[in-house]
Amino acid sequence: MASSKERESLVYIARLAEQAERYDEMVDAMKNVANLDVELTVEERNLLSVGYKNVVGSRRASWRILSSIEQKEDARGNEQNVKRIQGYRQKVESELTDICNNIMTVIDEHLIPSCTAGESTVFYYKMKGDYYRYLAEFKTGDDKKEVSDLSLKAYQTATTTAEAELPITHPIRLGLALNFSVFYYEIMNSPERACQLAKQVFDEAISELDSLNEDNYKDGTLILQLLRDNLTLWTSDIPEDGEEAPKGDAANKVGAGEDAE
């Protein structure tokens, strides 16, 4: 059994790594805390989430840049450059796959089994939905269908628990709704379903805004703003009666939507 001193030391290193923007080491430290099979505190949970979000975020940004350059080179007919870019893009995809599989193992084997609070359960299933969604951004064919289905299942489990355990204005529940709606828009290519979910949660939360305590007010109102921004963006993609729906992968649209930490 690990001593509380060891746990304290790992958390301190994670804080230092965050300050120094050394996110790979931040992830390593918090993964070691998770491997102790203890229920994480809110701070520990957030450190783990921020670390992985940054580690995966830099690769997602790289992948988008490479995909954009690849499309331009392809349009110019530069086949040799397209092949070079594809090889490099696949390297980034391999890194993304490893990172996402890594956090999924930590969640399934250590974090969820150590959970006692509904809030933590929602947090971890939301994370699972998010990281399967990140895989679905670049996977193709049957692989994409598999990770999309797993993402949907995780978001649905998180939503069921959130509806039973958390008030509608809780930042974790709002963040879940935000990311779940982004999933419908980007991965399922369904602006109608994305808008329906985002609008329902936005309207319910706005009517309960007075119940937000001081600690949650800033985070809650920020996520509500993101929900509203996405609704404004996505509404333009819903066809009027008699019009055709927009073609193409939603993830390739400009400003496909913002998600929460």
Swiss-Prot record:
Matching SMART domains: 14_3_3
InterPro entries assigned to the protein according to its UniProt record, in alphabetical order: 14-3-3, 14-3-3_CS, 14-3-3_dom_sf, 14-3-3_domain
PROSITE patterns for this protein: 1433_1, 1433_2
Gene Ontology CC annotations of this record: cytoplasm
GO aspect biological process, one term: signal transduction
Region span, Disordered: 237-261
Gene3D superfamilies linked: 14-3-3 domain
Record's subunit section: Homodimer.
Similarity comment text for this entry: Belongs to the 14-3-3 family.
UniProt name for this protein: 14-3-3 protein 8
Organism: Solanum lycopersicum (Tomato)
